Amino acid sequence: MRDRAFWETWLRRSAAPLRDRMRSVRDWYRAAGVAKGERRAFRAALKSLGETVDRKKSGKFGRRSGREPAAEKPSLARGKGHGRDREGVQREGRLRFTREGRPIVILDSPQEPAIRIPGHALSDALPKDRVLVRMEKRRGGAPPYGRIVRVVERGIREFVGRYGIAGGRRFVRFRDREADFALPVAVPRGLDPEPGELVLAEITEYPEGGKEGRATVVRLLGKSHTMETIALAVTSSRRIPAKFSEGALEEAGRIPPTVRVERGREKRERNGHLPRVDQRALPFVTIDGEDARDFDDAVCLVSERGRNRLLVAIADVSHYVPLGGQIDRDAYARGTSVYFPDRCIPMLPPSLSEGVCSLKPGVNRLTMTVDIPFNEQGRPGTASFSPSLIRSRARLTYDDVHSFLTQRQEGRKGGRMPGEIGEMLRRMEVFAGRLSLARADRGALDFDLPEAKLVVRGGLPSEVRAAPRWESHRLIEEFMLLANTAVAEFLSSRGFPFLFRIHEPPAEDRMEEFEEAAAKLLKKARTTERRDISSRLRAWAAAARGGKYERFINMLLLRSLMLARYGPESLGHFGLALTRYTHFTSPIRRYPDLIVHRVLKAALGDGDFAPYVRTISAAGKEMGVHLSGRERDAMDAERDVERRAKALYISSRAEETFSGVITSLTGFGFYVELEECLVEGFVPISSLRDDEYRFSADRGEWLGVVRRRKFSPGVGLRVRLRKADVDRGEIDFLVVGTIDRPPFS
């Protein structure tokens, strides 16, 4: 039997990552695997170390939700706060609430831990507000906390919520994964919402000086969610602008929808300083997804006297977006396009993103071409760059190219592909394969995790399936990587400031946690003979390849990595094993690419962009932080819509039973991903009534005390829907049985 001294040692080592989730002493018992006879010693250890728990109540932070906060779904440890805990230090961040209603502030750097905010220190802030926080000390050596000094920027102006009436007062309740609050609401004449109906509301008064805020109903949305209401809920609460400013639309309206061609192969741009090369005779094609709307890139592989050249033509967005104009300001504020299953919120007005900038087939388009020669061994040489004019021969899809290439490989006649293009695709496949091998040789990480594709019909999700990943995808990926790298090397060699795409190596503590988890799953000693991080990660991926834990090792590996970002420093790209890398190939949908296009033109001698280079030199760091943040905002919005859409989809199949596999564990249960449709849901341990289960973080399992039934990653289960919450994008499953064979095998 373990005594108080044992438990004090255990708590010093293990309490920190668990503390936020422990809201009753019973939670501590489960997390630590405390036997009944050890509970007195464990409580004494808790008390001696200042871990206060109210055993009579559900927890000091409100009602128990049965699952852990979204930000704490199993992930690897974050880095230290870099001195941000010192008393008096002030930091800016975004206020959010955990699922238990506990306020925290998320700082701009994703590597820094969140700041805890007690309820009495919230001031007048609402969830999603950008706030200034001052660190303050607690008595008795307890961890410091944050006090909100002021609201820097309001996070929500409009929101989708449920209308209700209570005590004769009308209100709208807003709920998502980060917030849950209600505001009194006014209902304009002509609108008559029913209790429980979804409405779009606008906040007219924010809570200040003890006064409660107020809202007004703007639009009625019906009783049930659709893809439209989900998209509206996410974009409004996350400040994703759905409309362009009037100035941007007026500016876009003045741009001719077609490209006027001057005679001659090399003519200067109108009001420009660089010759534009006429490449319309070359067989450029675009290869994109079937539902793509904007075509940034076209590719062409030509052979001249036994020498091969790859040409990557990218939409010349900088020609159409004047520096400092309203389109430019709107695009910078957005930072990126946002893609949902059934719609896109573009960075540029549609007349540009889907019109004159998009490389549609059979029409003249202005581009920037990267021309890369290959030697006889198939190795790329020094690239050249030029403004260009192309006319795409065909708009191909990944499916088109995959079907054509696989039919040839299987000995059947190629599909309906023009001869010249078909032959070019076959040669492209060979060159892409060589590039892929070279990438592996230099130590780049390469692992595929299936992504879900949601099919929408009639405004509702009708199907969720794994998106295919074929050689046609890899072909374009390799060519874009090569073009981006060529631009980064060219600009760096000439000393021009621009935004690099930076991916730093994972922190050592993240690596240790990943290797510890991987070793448990694979029952294999940690790989210590390789000292560099990349080799260690690739060794673990290789050890798992082809086995039942391959997916889980890849998921853990992905979570151990740092987030990529933009910045003016040349810090390398860890995942690609490149010293210098940038984003150049998607200027229609990414503002950093537009920056790089402008700097490239300056490097090629276009004097119009010389002042812009000085701007990048002075403000590159600030721009990188802003654009990295907008990228994360877009990714969060896309994930939020996907989670809600999956919850809506699975709610229509409430009577069915599914095969799934455990993907991860928490102190409150475990997550299961369905084999059929890649929908993930949570199984609260409290829903298992056949035994008393104890959680062992060391062994990575939930284990039944009596029946010894074990739940651990990789275990196959039969489950059915217990609850689907579309507002929060949360799904709960109920276990109805086990399966012998591992799913996804």
Regions found by a protein language model. Name each.
Residues 200, 206-207, 233, 247-695, ...:
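Electropositive polyanion-binding surfaces
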Residues 1-311, 318-363, 395, 400-405, ...:
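Charge-lined substrate channels and their catalytic hotspots, especially those that engage the 3′ end
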